């Protein structure tokens, strides 16, 4: 993004063919060939300075990165001042040779956007019942409960022009349609929305070119790959977005300069050449964007997420913007890009955008929530929106005149942006009315919009809309979807995939290490010294081969969660045409081939000779090859499933359907001869079939199995015949071919899924008909203003509060220096984030914590709150004069985190009620608590949406600003003595921010200690605070003291410093303060504000205050409570169970799917094993029934514990927050989590038993039926509690999934199904007894057949069934009572371990 990326209409208009819009590769080479030749060959004719500059082009070395950084450090020493000179130097070079830059003019005429939303009678929230109704829509209609759909106008007949060279501000309250307008103008609207009206770029309709490549929409949501650094993210974006027509501009400029004998500016020439090189791995443009966005300090820091330490919220927001502006687009539509940024950083960034717009002729529309006056004045034009209508669109400096004509006047010292948004509110509008109060009536947005259209400004705006098309032509527009050639796209995506695999090395190493451990265990179980070549041991060899295939198949399951994790970023980049789906899919698949080879090699190297397979090198490699193809086949299938279904719950559901199918028709659990003939097709389409055929004929057709005979048939052939796997050797290669075909098929399916399956659409929620009618009548029935803040003040006064000051002295905080920084030459192994912080927070004094993004504000709050889980803390923190005791401090603390973490399946009111229930003292009765909750909801203006589901960020439920207010409400309702708020107004518009701060101010007056980090406060909000702590980069304080009336104390302090500019009249003092204390000002004036503060009287006053407050008040006692938690254990359990019940009831995706899997599995098993329970002639018949029992117990159990992993992980982050707040003990939470599973598991088991029991034909006696139900129920509970335990023991879903597959394989190995208990080596038999499945199969088989005395033929001998069970399996009916006790003991032991793990382990890195 620079002026050199612009295009030239004059020489573009000279071409008649569209082909000439693309730069010929030969012509490009003429421009940069001297640079690249000298870069590669080191020409002797180039001086040293020039050769160093040539390294800037595409040098990925450490020295190259340093040179690129130094290039801009010298060029842009002070970004705010030097950037405009830099752009002017580029502009002067282009203008000097009369190359005019094209521009984009965007017109929209009578644009309307309509969405459909569901309405429903009664409960409108997603639930098991509502989802079931939806699944049976025909029945629902008969019952008169059909779902209705209502049409919502998101945008309503809006028109206007976005002109180049003019920076446009988009203002309006949340929900007014700003994002929809920006998406519409950039061509990014969802296809499900109904759009009418016209949008054109330079006169061309959106369907005549590629708007996604011509313009860039920058979302308010930050979607990035957590494992990549900032620089890597931008380099990849720059590489994929390409260089546009920068080379063409450079070619024309260079040609004209050469003809005129002009020597170009050396720095500008190097810059323009460097950013014109196609497909550059390391771009100088990245360093430019890092510089102007203030991200160079964290350039080599990983982005991170909720579980990985990374960027701050403000840094991540800037990265979202930087990711798009690093490209060559000429029009930008930016949605709330300043959320989480301080006013100084916002001013610097918007200043750069203003300069780019005005000098380099860009087209920009920027939506902001809380622009300061200084930022507001940077804009040329203004669009004001409300309720989907445009209230004003025109020059910024004429907006006040228009509203004066409408009867509204902006008061003195009132910020214009605040005024413009508040006059749209029915609560705030009257205070700005210029006429007599009695003549005032509320003027709705609809009326204001009509008044604007009738005004001369509105009429003037509409006139050119219907004028002829622009003559600027096509030069500024993009007509190709992709910037890179196919090969370059594959290279870019391949390089990134390799990087991400390297960053995920822990997962791969952990997975392979686990495989090696299982291989060693398997080898020792089937040890060659215990295996001989008789028929019985041939069965064991068959089991070992089956287990090897199963293990290799399960080894790839983490691929699902890893793929799902990257899908949001993929869909974002795909929508911007960074790359094609195939460019992503092929590297993501092909680069995993070495993983398949390594895992298969590890397995076979340990097991082949250890187990005692045929000692032949060729057969060794044949088995190895087969396992490689199996691994690739199933992992390709897993990737396809993840890309198609996109959510963990849905993906694991279909994964287990697939695995169930493979196991059923694989030829081992039920041999082919025992299958119903009409189901043989299933045998031939299962990849496991071909894996079985290939491995068993490779082993059992070896010469050693052809010597001894049974009934004139060799042992090898007999075992193959019994399992229906007797095929000639060439079937090995047929199996290889079939598996290879499945790999190609799944590769293609993966690519097609990514290409054609759209990202999961936002869930807009259903709306009750009653509420919809109320909204439609809003214009005629306006709610009267309520004095919510006074209510909350009175309510809080009824609950006693302890007034406690906080002091902190010489507070330091260090973390281990990230490896990326060490590689870049950072000198020390510890990185200091807080540097000798000293201060005091007092009751009744509202303190603001401010500073540039990354200065350490959140870090300071985390240290004070005790939230840090890593790093090194030094210094003294005292509460009420006594050293802080964390266990008691959390009882009086309310901490509003920057990340809004809530349970997605609760409503707004339920979330607040839950917090009040567990955090208010026990003496507060239920009625008072309910009233208190209602008043808090009204205070933060959530009462109107109290029944709305919280939902998942960026997908459904509450908007960003509503989530922020919910975070505040959840903490305020706890009635804390100390409140720490991390950016409580981020994401709120000015009016909502004022409401929140007003409420906080009133709360503070009741004797609470309150501190808020805050960005971009308006003058009114800033002066609502009493004291200020101002920080700079490096975690240092540069001011700590009172703000003063009209900010007099702060202004007085900084104006005394030599070189600091005086504050202007009507200037926002907070913005002025941030501006004059910026790093660039320190460099310009050669000063350090932290040192100046340390030497000031202000600092000495604070030290004295800290010393005074660090001494306990006489006769006071250290803060303590008789109990650790506000509520007793029973109330905790009851509240947690209440919440879990709502969460589970409203999670139909999770619960309905597992019920569906149970029913489907039972039906399929019932058909496959139809009436086989009483067919008992030989050992194979018993093995068939045993296989049915094994499949039934393991399939449903394994799905339960795999599917609960992602489901439980979502709630785990919430649990960390609630547990830190002291809401409940680990035991209460874990017992509630375990208890809520019981009714759902009970339903599963009931359905399974009622279907499978009669289908297979088990014995119909009450005793046997109860035993079957009881065993299946205990087994299912054990499986699901194992899943919960794995979540509590692991840092993320991927590792938990790997351990789950480890558990599954060990369960199978020691269940008695693969190898019966008497044959398990004595050194491993203890694992048999620790395996729940072994007891399950013992109970199932013994309860059915333990008293059956019918004789059967078993391995050439005649025995009764009961004796065979005892001899072969080690099962005896006399042990059933012990088995029953062990079965019920397993769930209880697992619950206790789950509780203990939650108590001891915290994987959240802070």
Curated annotation (Swiss-Prot):
SUPFAM superfamilies given in the database record: P-loop containing nucleoside triphosphate hydrolases
GO molecular function: ABC-type transporter activity; ATP binding; ATP hydrolysis activity
Topology with respect to the bilayer: Multi-pass membrane protein
Binding site for ATP 2: 851-858
Pfam families xref list: ABC2_membrane (PF01061), ABC2_membrane_7 (PF19055), ABC_tran (PF00005), PDR_assoc (PF08370)
Residues holding ATP 1: 172-179
Record keywords: ATP-binding, Membrane, Nucleotide-binding, Repeat, Transmembrane, Transmembrane helix, Transport
InterPro entries, per database record: AAA+_ATPase, ABC2_TM, ABC_transporter-like_ATP-bd, ABCG_dom, ABCG_PDR_1, ABCG_PDR_2, P-loop_NTPase, PDR_assoc
Segments passing through the bilayer: 506-526, 535-555, 593-613, 624-644, 650-670, 734-754, 1155-1175, 1185-1207, 1238-1258, 1265-1285, 1295-1315, 1323-1343, 1378-1398
Family: Belongs to the ABC transporter superfamily. ABCG family. PDR (TC 3.A.1.205) subfamily.
Protein name, entry field: ABC transporter G family member 50
């Amino acid at each position: 993004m620079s002026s050199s990326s612009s295009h030239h209409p004059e020489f573009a208009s000279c071409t008649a063919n569209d082909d000439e819009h693309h730069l010929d590769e030969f012509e490009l080479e003429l421009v940069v060939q001297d640079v690249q030749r000298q870069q590669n060959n080191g020409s002797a004719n180039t001086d040293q300075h020039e050769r160093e500059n040539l390294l800037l082009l595409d040098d990925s070395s450490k020295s190259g990165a340093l040179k690129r950084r130094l290039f801009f450090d010298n060029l842009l020493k002070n970004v705010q001042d030097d950037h405009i000179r830099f752009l002017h130097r580029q502009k002067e070079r282009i203008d000097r040779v009369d190359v005019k830059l094209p521009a984009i003019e965007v017109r929209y005429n009578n644009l309307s956007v309509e969405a459909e939303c569901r309405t429903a009678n009664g409960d409108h929230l997603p639930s098991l019942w509502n989802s079931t109704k939806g699944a049976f829509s025909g029945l629902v209609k008969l019952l008169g409960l059909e779902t209705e759909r209502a049409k919502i106008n998101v945008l309503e007949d809006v028109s206007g022009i976005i002109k180049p060279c003019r920076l446009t501000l988009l203002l309006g309250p949340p929900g007014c349609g700003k994002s929809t307008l920006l998406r519409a103008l950039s061509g990014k609207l969802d296809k499900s929305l109904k759009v009418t009206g016209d949008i054109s770029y330079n006169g061309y309709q959106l369907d005549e070119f590629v708007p996604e490549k011509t313009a860039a929409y920058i979302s308010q949501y930050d979607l990035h790959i957590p494992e990549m650094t900032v620089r890597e993210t931008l380099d990849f974006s720059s590489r994929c977005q390409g260089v546009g027509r920068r080379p063409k501009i450079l070619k024309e400029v260079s040609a004209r300069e050469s003809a005129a004998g002009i020597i170009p500016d050396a720095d500008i020439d190097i810059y323009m050449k460097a950013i014109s090189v196609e497909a550059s791995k390391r771009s100088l443009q990245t360093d430019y964007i890092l510089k102007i966005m203030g991200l160079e300090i964290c350039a080599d820091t990983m982005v991170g997420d909720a579980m990985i330490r990374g960027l701050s919220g403000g840094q991540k927001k800037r990265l979202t913007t930087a990711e798009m502006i690093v490209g060559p687009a000429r029009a930008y539509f930016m949605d709330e890009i300043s959320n989480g940024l301080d006013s100084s950083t916002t001013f610097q960034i918007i200043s750069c955008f203003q300069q780019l717009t005005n000098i380099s002729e860009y087209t920009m529309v920027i939506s902001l929530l809380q622009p300061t006056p200084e930022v507001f004045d940077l804009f040329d034009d203004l669009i004001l929106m409300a309720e989907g209508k445009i209230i004003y669109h025109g020059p910024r400096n004429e907006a006040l005149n228009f509203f004066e004509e409408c009867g509204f006047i902006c008061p003195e010292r009132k910020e214009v942006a605040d005024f413009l948004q508040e006059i749209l509110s029915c609560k705030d509008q009257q205070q700005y009315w210029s006429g007599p109060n009695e003549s005032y009536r509320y003027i709705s947005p609809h009326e204001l919009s009509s008044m604007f259209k009738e005004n001369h400004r509105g009429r003037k705006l509409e006139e050119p809309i219907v004028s002829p098309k622009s003559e600027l032509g096509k030069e500024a527009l993009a007509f190709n979807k992709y910037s890179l050639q196919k090969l370059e796209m594959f290279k870019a995506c391949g390089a990134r995939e390799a990087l991400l695999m390297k960053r995920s090395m822990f997962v791969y190493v952990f997975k392979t290490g686990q495989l090696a451990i299982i291989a060693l265990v398997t080898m020792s179980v089937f040890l060659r010294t215990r295996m001989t070549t008789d028929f019985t041991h041939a069965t064991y060899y068959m089991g070992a081969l089956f287990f090897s295939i199963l293990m290799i198949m399960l080894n790839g399951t983490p691929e699902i969660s890893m793929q799902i994790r990257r899908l949001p970023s993929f869909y974002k980049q795909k929508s911007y045409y960074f790359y094609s789906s195939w460019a992503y899919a092929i590297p993501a698949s092909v680069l995993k081939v070495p993983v398949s080879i390594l895992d298969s090699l590890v397995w076979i190297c340990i097991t082949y000779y250890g187990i005692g397979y045929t000692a032949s090198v060729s057969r060794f490699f044949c088995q190895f090859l087969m396992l490689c193809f199996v691994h690739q086949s199933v992992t390709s299938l897993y990737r396809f499933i993840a890309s198609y279904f996109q959510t963990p719950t849905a993906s694991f559901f279909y994964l287990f359907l697939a695995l169930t199918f493979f196991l059923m028709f694989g030829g081992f659990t039920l041999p082919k001869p025992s299958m119903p003939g009409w189901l043989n097709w299933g045998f031939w389409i299962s990849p496991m079939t071909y894996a079985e055929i290939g491995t068993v004929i490779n082993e059992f057709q070896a010469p050693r199995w052809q010597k001894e005979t049974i009934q004139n048939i060799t042992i090898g052939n007999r075992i193959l015949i019994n399992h229906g796997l007797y095929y000639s050797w060439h079937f090995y290669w047929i199996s290889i071919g079939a598996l290879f075909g499945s790999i190609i098929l799944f590769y293609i399916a993966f690519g097609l899924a990514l290409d054609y399956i759209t990202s999961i659409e936002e869930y807009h929620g259903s709306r009750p008909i009653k509420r919809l009618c109320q909204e439609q009548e809003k214009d005629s029935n306006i709610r009267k203003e309520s004095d919510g803040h006074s209510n909350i003040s009175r309510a809080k006064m009824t609950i006693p509060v302890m007034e406690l000051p906080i002091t902190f002295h010489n507070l330091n905080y260090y973390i281990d220096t990230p490896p990326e920084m060490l590689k870049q030459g950072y000198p020390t192994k510890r990185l200091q984030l807080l540097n000798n912080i000293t201060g005091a927070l007092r009751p009744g004094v509202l303190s603001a914590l401010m500073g540039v993004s990354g200065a350490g504000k959140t870090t300071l709050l985390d240290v004070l709150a005790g939230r840090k889980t890593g790093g090194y803390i030094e210094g003294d923190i005292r509460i009420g004069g006594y050293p802080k005791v964390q266990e008691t401090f959390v009882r009086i603390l309310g901490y509003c985190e920057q990340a809004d973490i809530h349970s997605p399946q609760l409503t707004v009111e339920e979330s607040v009620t839950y917090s009040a229930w567990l955090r208010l003292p026990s003496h507060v009765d239920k009625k008072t608590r309910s009233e208190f909750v209602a008043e808090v909801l009204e205070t933060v203006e959530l009462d109107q949406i109290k029944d709305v589901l919280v939902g998942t960020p960026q997908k459904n439920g509450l908007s960003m600003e509503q989530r922020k207010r919910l975070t505040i409400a959840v903490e305020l309702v706890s009635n804390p003595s100390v409140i720490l708020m991390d950016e409580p107004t981020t994401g709120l518009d000015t009016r909502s921010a004022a409401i929140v701060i007003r409420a906080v101010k009133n709360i503070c007056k009741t004797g609470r200690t309150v501190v808020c980090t805050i960005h971009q406060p308006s003058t009114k909000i800033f002066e609502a605070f009493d004291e200020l702590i101002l920080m700079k980069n490096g975690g240092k304080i540069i001011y700590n003291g009172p703000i003063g009336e009209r900010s007099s104390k702060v202004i007085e302090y900084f104006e005394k410093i030599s070189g600091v500019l005086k504050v202007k009249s009507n200037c926002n003092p907070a913005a002025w303060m941030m501006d004059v204390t910026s790093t660039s000002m320190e460099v310009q004036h050669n000063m350090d504000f932290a040192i100046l503060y340390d030497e000031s009287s202000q600092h000495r006053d604070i030290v004295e205050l800290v010393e005074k407050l660090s001494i306990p008040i006489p006769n006071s006692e250290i803060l303590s409570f008789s109990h650790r938690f506000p509520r007793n254990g029973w109330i905790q359990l009851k509240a947690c169970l209440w919440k879990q019940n709502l969460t589970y009831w409203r999670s139909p995706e999770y619960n309905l799917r597992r019920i569906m899997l149970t029913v489907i599995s039972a039906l399929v098993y019932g058909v496959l094993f139809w009436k086989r329970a009483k067919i008992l002639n030989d050992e194979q018949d018993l093995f068939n029934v045993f296989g049915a029992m094994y499949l039934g117990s393991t399939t449903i159990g394994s799905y339960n514990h795999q599917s609960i992993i992602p489901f439980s992980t979502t709630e785990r982050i919430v649990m960390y927050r609630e547990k830190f707040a002291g809401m409940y003990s680990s035991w209460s939470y874990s017992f509630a989590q375990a208890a809520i599973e019981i009714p759902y598991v009970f339903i599963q088991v009931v359905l399974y038993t009622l279907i499978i029991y009669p289908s297979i034909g088990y014995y119909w006696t009450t005793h046997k039926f109860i035993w079957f139900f009881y065993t299946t129920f205990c087994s299912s509970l054990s499986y699901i509690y194992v899943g919960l335990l794995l979540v509590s023991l692991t840092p993320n879903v991927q590792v938990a999934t790997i351990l789950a597959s480890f558990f599954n394989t060990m369960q199978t190995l020691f269940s008695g199904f693969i190898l019966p208990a008497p044959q398990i080596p004595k050194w491993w038999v203890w694992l048999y007894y620790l395996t729940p499945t072994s007891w399950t199969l013992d109970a199932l088989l013994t309860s059915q057949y333990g008293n059956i005395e019918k004789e059967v033929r078993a391995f050439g001998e005649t025995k009764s069934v009961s004796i065979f069970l005892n001899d072969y399996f080690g099962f005896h009916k006399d042990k059933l009572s012990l088995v029953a006790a062990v079965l019920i003991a397993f769930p209880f032991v697992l619950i206790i371990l789950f509780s203990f793990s939650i108590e001891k382990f915290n994987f959240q890195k802070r």
